[in-house]
């Protein structure tokens, strides 16, 4: 999914990036990329998450009680519902 995102992003940048007078394509694209994502980290970012995501996960894992951890999906986080399963079923369907 991330690879498709980057291909689409680079196609859009190549089409829409304004070039300054006598500038190179890299100078126009450089302003559109986040500060922590350099060309050296582009390939690594395709297979791993960005540092800010890892820091968020590290803070969530240090939460003392499992029921107090946040549930994150598509960068939206909210408290986990409690309980995840009904207690009256006792493992039966």
UniProtKB/Swiss-Prot annotation:
<dbReference type="GO" id="GO:0090729">
    <property type="term" value="F:toxin activity"/>
</dbReference>
<keyword id="KW-0208">D-amino acid</keyword>
<dbReference type="GO" id="GO:0005576">
    <property type="term" value="C:extracellular region"/>
</dbReference>
<comment type="similarity">
    <text>Belongs to the conotoxin C superfamily. Consomatin family.</text>
</comment>
<feature type="disulfide bond">
    <location>
        <begin position="72"/>
        <end position="77"/>
    </location>
</feature>
<feature type="signal peptide">
    <location>
        <begin position="1"/>
        <end position="22"/>
    </location>
</feature>
<feature type="propeptide">
    <location>
        <begin position="23"/>
        <end position="69"/>
    </location>
</feature>
<feature type="propeptide">
    <location>
        <begin position="79"/>
        <end position="93"/>
    </location>
</feature>
<comment type="function">
    <text>Potently activates human somatostatin receptors (SSTR) with a specific activation of SSTR2 (EC(50)=2.6 nM).</text>
</comment>
<keyword id="KW-0964">Secreted</keyword>
<keyword id="KW-1213">G-protein coupled receptor impairing toxin</keyword>
<protein>
    <recommendedName>
        <fullName>Consomatin G1</fullName>
    </recommendedName>
</protein>
<keyword id="KW-0732">Signal</keyword>
<keyword id="KW-1015">Disulfide bond</keyword>
<feature type="modified residue" description="D-tryptophan">
    <location>
        <position position="74"/>
    </location>
</feature>
<keyword id="KW-0800">Toxin</keyword>
